[in-house]
Amino acid sequence: MGLPWYRVHTVVLNDPGRLLSVHIMHTALVSGWAGSMALYELAVFDPSDPVLDPMWRQGMFVIPFMTRLGITNSWGGWSISGGSITNPGIWSYEGVAGAHIVFSGLCFLAAIWHWVYWDLEIFCDERTGKPSLDLPKIFGIHLFLSGLACFGFGAFHVTGLYGPGIWVSDPYGLTGKVQSINPAWGVEGFDPFVPGGIASHHIAAGTLGILAGLFHLSVRPPQRLYKGLRMGNIETVLSSSIAAVFFAAFVVAGTMWYGSATTPIELFGPTRYQWDQGYFQQEIYRRVGVGLAENLSLSEAWSKIPEKLAFYDYIGNNPAKGGLFRAGSMDNGDGIAVGWLGHPIFRDKEGRELFVRRMPTFFETFPVVLVDVDGIVRADVPFRRAESKYSVEQVGVTVEFYGGELNGVSYSDPTTVKKYARRAQLGEIFELDRATLKSDGVFRSSPRGWFTFGHASFALLFFFGHIWHGARTLFRDVFAGIDPDLDAQVEFGAFQKIGDPTTRRQAV
């Protein structure tokens, strides 16, 4: 049936058995990809340093999703939070991957069975003997079952009543772990950063889905509505399904890019807005201030800053710094972080503390400018040395490190001072290993960036798909030239416009 590539799906348009078959095969492909991708990631994942080389630095995509749902252990004897374990149980990373692959195989066999045995009694209308589907009834069944799954996830899995709970962390991504969640039924449940809202919203939405499903199973649509929305046409189902999918894709693109309780920074990396707002920098300075108030020395106060917190405050972990067409993990860009060198404090010869102005997200290069506590420029690395007034040499800038590997070390030679001033533009300074992976030094995005870009792009495409198929089903008679209420037998090919005797073709 020489169909063009963009019309091949019409072969299942009036064939319920094979329509079911291709959907089962699609599920097999999705599940098989998920399981295979998980096994591939587990083969290349290095769990040895969860602080400086976490999953998101290594470009892991499916491991974070398993982890946020409560999977933390591997049959390889390691745990995502570091350390070793002896009894990971069946629901380890490998167990979940294997379950997806087994499920994929079963779906594959089911798809073949339904393709071969397509002409089943269940698909036949007993009044006409022709294949047909009761689409409003099927909608009710699907709504009921998805509501049941939604309710079960919120009431049992997330709450820990029968399940592990989900990944929960503090606002700075330092203390994350899998734990059970109490539903948040107050106004706080609408805060996207409150995990309790995940439980309560799934319970509420699931309950609504169950009730709506039962409603659609027990109440038939009015005839006018049935005809108006073309409820008997399978393309109506396609159009509304695409709408549900693109809406969900837009929502998750937003929750991923802007951050939420469902996308913890320990699993997906920080958001770009945390760099833009100096989010981690402010917390670090607050902690240092608390240490100084407790009569600790500057060195002791900085030494108490967790390496994990300092690492978040580094521009290389900003997902917006990676170019769209730079493939590979963050580790393939600026390298594998080995250790925090410490916090550099710059001073001029008059003893004033100077702060390096940080590079904004969308700059590749940025002038090195050092300002005092009042924001007045006191030193820089000039573009034209002949006209410079504030060069490091002229101002006599020195640098001393507090905390980290260089704790207590100071430099006064201008070359070294300028080197660390340039690196301080990028946030906290880390030693990076670029040799192991042959990293090229060009920043990459985190899985947060890839997920957002992918889902926003497909959401846009699916939006147009919804408009396209919605228009086709609503205006089918206009496009086809056939009145859907036409009862008379029409001879295809006899008229230029089907069923219109005024356009009878002339014999040649």
Curated annotation (Swiss-Prot):
It comes from the Eukaryota. It is a multi-pass membrane protein. Keywords: Chlorophyll, Chloroplast, Chromophore, Membrane, Photosynthesis, Photosystem II, Plastid, Thylakoid, Transmembrane, Transmembrane helix. One of its GO terms (molecular function) is electron transporter, transferring electrons within the cyclic electron transport pathway of photosynthesis activity. InterPro entries: PS_antenna-like (IPR000932), PS_II_antenna-like_sf (IPR036001), PSII_PsbB (IPR017486). Pfam families: PSII. The keyword Cell membrane does not apply. Binds multiple chlorophylls. PSII binds additional chlorophylls, carotenoids and specific lipids. One of the components of the core complex of photosystem II (PSII). It binds chlorophyll and helps catalyze the primary light-induced photochemical processes of PSII. PSII is a light-driven water:plastoquinone oxidoreductase, using light energy to abstract electrons from H(2)O, generating O(2) and a proton gradient subsequently used for ATP formation. This is Photosystem II CP47 reaction center protein. The lineage of its organism: Eukaryota, Viridiplantae, Streptophyta, Embryophyta, Tracheophyta.
